[in-house]
Amino acid sequence: MKIVPLVERPELVDQVAAWGFAEWGHLNPGQTLHSRTARIRETMDADRVPIVLVALDDAGLLVGTASLLFDDLEGDTRNPWLASVFVPAGQRGKGTASALVVAVEDAARRLGYPILYLFTTSAARLYGRLGWRALERRDYRGEHIQVMDKAL
Protein backbone atom coordinates (compact mmCIF):
# COMPACT_ATOMS: atom_id res chain seq x y z
CA MET A 1 0.00 0.00 0.00
CA LYS A 2 1.08 3.54 -0.77
CA ILE A 3 -0.33 6.78 0.66
CA VAL A 4 -0.06 9.95 -1.42
CA PRO A 5 -1.65 13.41 -1.46
CA LEU A 6 -4.79 13.50 -3.60
CA VAL A 7 -3.23 16.38 -5.55
CA GLU A 8 -0.90 13.73 -7.07
CA ARG A 9 -3.89 11.66 -8.25
CA PRO A 10 -6.56 14.24 -9.23
CA GLU A 11 -8.47 11.65 -11.25
CA LEU A 12 -9.56 10.18 -7.89
CA VAL A 13 -11.33 13.34 -6.66
CA ASP A 14 -14.78 12.21 -7.81
CA GLN A 15 -14.55 8.89 -5.95
CA VAL A 16 -13.15 10.49 -2.78
CA ALA A 17 -15.96 13.08 -2.83
CA ALA A 18 -18.61 10.41 -3.46
CA TRP A 19 -17.39 8.31 -0.52
CA GLY A 20 -17.40 11.32 1.78
CA PHE A 21 -20.81 12.51 0.68
CA ALA A 22 -22.36 9.05 1.08
CA GLU A 23 -20.80 8.54 4.52
CA TRP A 24 -21.13 12.00 6.09
CA GLY A 25 -23.37 14.10 3.84
CA HIS A 26 -26.10 14.09 6.50
CA LEU A 27 -23.73 15.95 8.86
CA ASN A 28 -23.29 18.77 6.34
CA PRO A 29 -26.71 20.23 5.55
CA GLY A 30 -26.77 22.22 2.36
CA GLN A 31 -23.79 20.41 0.91
CA THR A 32 -24.31 18.53 -2.34
CA LEU A 33 -22.09 15.97 -4.01
CA HIS A 34 -21.25 18.60 -6.60
CA SER A 35 -20.26 21.20 -3.98
CA ARG A 36 -18.18 18.64 -2.05
CA THR A 37 -16.38 17.61 -5.23
CA ALA A 38 -15.72 21.23 -6.21
CA ARG A 39 -14.41 22.11 -2.74
CA ILE A 40 -11.98 19.18 -2.77
CA ARG A 41 -10.82 19.96 -6.29
CA GLU A 42 -10.28 23.66 -5.50
CA THR A 43 -8.40 23.16 -2.23
CA MET A 44 -6.20 20.14 -2.95
CA ASP A 45 -2.70 20.68 -1.62
CA ALA A 46 0.19 18.66 -0.23
CA ASP A 47 1.93 21.36 1.79
CA ARG A 48 -0.83 23.26 3.59
CA VAL A 49 -4.20 22.55 5.14
CA PRO A 50 -6.51 21.20 3.80
CA ILE A 51 -4.66 18.06 2.76
CA VAL A 52 -6.49 15.02 1.42
CA LEU A 53 -4.52 11.76 1.36
CA VAL A 54 -5.40 8.62 -0.55
CA ALA A 55 -4.33 5.03 0.02
CA LEU A 56 -3.54 2.98 -3.06
CA ASP A 57 -3.14 -0.78 -3.20
CA ASP A 58 -0.25 -2.49 -4.98
CA ALA A 59 -2.13 -2.20 -8.29
CA GLY A 60 -2.61 1.55 -7.78
CA LEU A 61 -6.32 1.27 -7.00
CA LEU A 62 -7.94 3.59 -4.46
CA VAL A 63 -8.58 1.77 -1.16
CA GLY A 64 -9.06 4.63 1.31
CA THR A 65 -8.81 8.30 2.13
CA ALA A 66 -8.30 10.69 5.06
CA SER A 67 -7.93 14.44 5.44
CA LEU A 68 -6.27 17.13 7.52
CA LEU A 69 -8.74 20.02 7.82
CA PHE A 70 -9.53 23.19 9.69
CA ASP A 71 -12.96 23.74 11.28
CA ASP A 72 -14.29 20.20 10.85
CA LEU A 73 -16.64 20.47 13.81
CA GLU A 74 -18.87 23.52 13.43
CA GLY A 75 -18.76 25.81 16.45
CA ASP A 76 -15.51 24.34 17.77
CA THR A 77 -12.46 26.60 17.62
CA ARG A 78 -9.83 23.86 18.04
CA ASN A 79 -7.72 23.06 14.97
CA PRO A 80 -6.57 21.17 12.94
CA TRP A 81 -8.68 18.03 12.54
CA LEU A 82 -8.12 14.52 11.29
CA ALA A 83 -11.25 14.03 9.19
CA SER A 84 -13.00 11.90 6.60
CA VAL A 85 -11.14 8.67 7.30
CA PHE A 86 -12.84 6.19 4.99
CA VAL A 87 -12.02 2.70 3.77
CA PRO A 88 -14.64 0.81 1.72
CA ALA A 89 -16.17 -2.23 3.42
CA GLY A 90 -14.39 -4.73 1.17
CA GLN A 91 -11.00 -3.24 2.03
CA ARG A 92 -11.36 -3.06 5.81
CA GLY A 93 -9.30 -5.14 8.23
CA LYS A 94 -6.04 -4.65 6.33
CA GLY A 95 -4.61 -1.76 8.34
CA THR A 96 -5.49 0.88 5.76
CA ALA A 97 -7.38 3.17 8.14
CA SER A 98 -4.57 3.01 10.71
CA ALA A 99 -1.98 3.81 8.05
CA LEU A 100 -4.04 6.77 6.84
CA VAL A 101 -4.40 8.10 10.39
CA VAL A 102 -0.64 7.88 10.93
CA ALA A 103 -0.02 9.60 7.59
CA VAL A 104 -2.32 12.51 8.52
CA GLU A 105 -0.63 12.75 11.93
CA ASP A 106 2.74 12.90 10.14
CA ALA A 107 1.47 15.64 7.81
CA ALA A 108 0.20 17.71 10.75
CA ARG A 109 3.49 17.23 12.61
CA ARG A 110 5.47 18.24 9.49
CA LEU A 111 3.41 21.44 9.28
CA GLY A 112 4.24 22.25 12.91
CA TYR A 113 0.95 21.47 14.65
CA PRO A 114 1.47 20.22 18.22
CA ILE A 115 -1.96 18.62 18.58
CA LEU A 116 -4.61 17.13 16.32
CA TYR A 117 -8.35 16.66 16.92
CA LEU A 118 -11.02 14.37 15.52
CA PHE A 119 -14.61 13.45 16.06
CA THR A 120 -16.13 10.08 15.36
CA THR A 121 -19.51 8.43 15.55
CA SER A 122 -18.26 4.85 15.54
CA ALA A 123 -14.48 4.40 15.55
CA ALA A 124 -13.37 5.62 18.99
CA ARG A 125 -11.84 2.21 19.79
CA LEU A 126 -9.68 2.32 16.64
CA TYR A 127 -8.42 5.78 17.49
CA GLY A 128 -7.86 4.83 21.13
CA ARG A 129 -5.61 1.97 20.01
CA LEU A 130 -3.64 4.52 17.98
CA GLY A 131 -3.00 6.71 21.03
CA TRP A 132 -5.87 9.16 20.76
CA ARG A 133 -7.44 10.50 23.97
CA ALA A 134 -11.19 10.85 24.51
CA LEU A 135 -12.14 14.43 25.40
CA GLU A 136 -15.92 14.62 25.34
CA ARG A 137 -19.12 13.09 24.04
CA ARG A 138 -21.86 15.25 22.59
CA ASP A 139 -24.74 15.30 20.16
CA TYR A 140 -23.97 16.82 16.79
CA ARG A 141 -26.61 17.16 14.10
CA GLY A 142 -28.53 14.15 15.32
CA GLU A 143 -25.50 11.92 15.92
CA HIS A 144 -23.72 10.96 19.13
CA ILE A 145 -20.06 11.85 18.62
CA GLN A 146 -16.82 11.37 20.53
CA VAL A 147 -14.30 14.23 20.31
CA MET A 148 -10.69 13.10 20.69
CA ASP A 149 -7.21 14.57 20.51
CA LYS A 150 -3.62 13.46 20.15
CA ALA A 151 -0.44 15.32 21.04
CA LEU A 152 2.00 15.14 18.16
Range-by-range predicted roles:
Residues Q91-A103:
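Conserved acetyl-CoA pyrophosphate-binding loop and the N-cap/start of the following alpha-helix
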Residues R110, P114, T121-H144:
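Conserved active-site alpha-helix within GNAT-family acetyltransferase domains
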Residues P50, E143-V147:
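Short hydrophobic/aromatic beta-strand or adjacent loop that forms the aromatic wall/cage
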Residues G25-L56, S67:
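Active-site rim helix/loop that mediates acceptor-substrate recognition in acyltransferases
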Residues V52-V54, L61-D71, N79-W81, F86:
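Conserved beta-strand in the GNAT
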Residues V85, L116-L118:
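Conserved hydrophobic beta-strand within the GNAT/NAT acetyltransferase core sheet
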Residues M1-V16:
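A short beta-loop-alpha structural element at the N-terminal edge
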